[in-house]
Amino acid sequence: MPSKPQTTRVKRASSTRVDLLREESIRTLREMEEAIVRTRNQLKTMETVMRRARRLLDAGRPAREVAQLANAAQARAATSAIIREVQGARHRAQRAQFKLAAAEGSTMAEIARGWGVSRQLVSRMVKEPSQRRKKV
């Protein structure tokens, strides 16, 4: 009778470590939620800027004046910065989730299937050090 391929289980972490990883996961998800709120607010601001630019163009203003009058450069820079922020928050939250799942005993393959990513990505992110939060 052919044997079933064995799935390598990650060794379960201590309950203290799992608790710390759970706290980190919750914190990073909260940070991501906050970044998403800031992103939504910035996108609303950007929408207002674009609407103003469109109206200025519609009113016959020269294109070379519209960007300056609508403060497009400032809005673009702020939007780019907030998108980078939400991408970083997403990465930290995902890494925390992967580490928690691994500590709870899930395999890299199980985690990858659940998130729709490659096992290699999960493995790499689980090995990444968690960045220490800056104290303010």
Model-identified regions with their sequence ranges:
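Short, amphipathic alpha-helical "recognition" segments used to contact nucleic acids or chromatin
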Residues: 90-106
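Short, Lys/Arg-enriched N-terminal segment that forms or immediately precedes the first helix
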Residues: 73-87
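Short, solvent-exposed alpha-helical "recognition" segments
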Residues: 89-92, 124-136
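General nucleic-acid-binding
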Residues: 2-70
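Short alpha-helical "recognition helix" segments of helix-turn-helix
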Residues: 107-117, 122
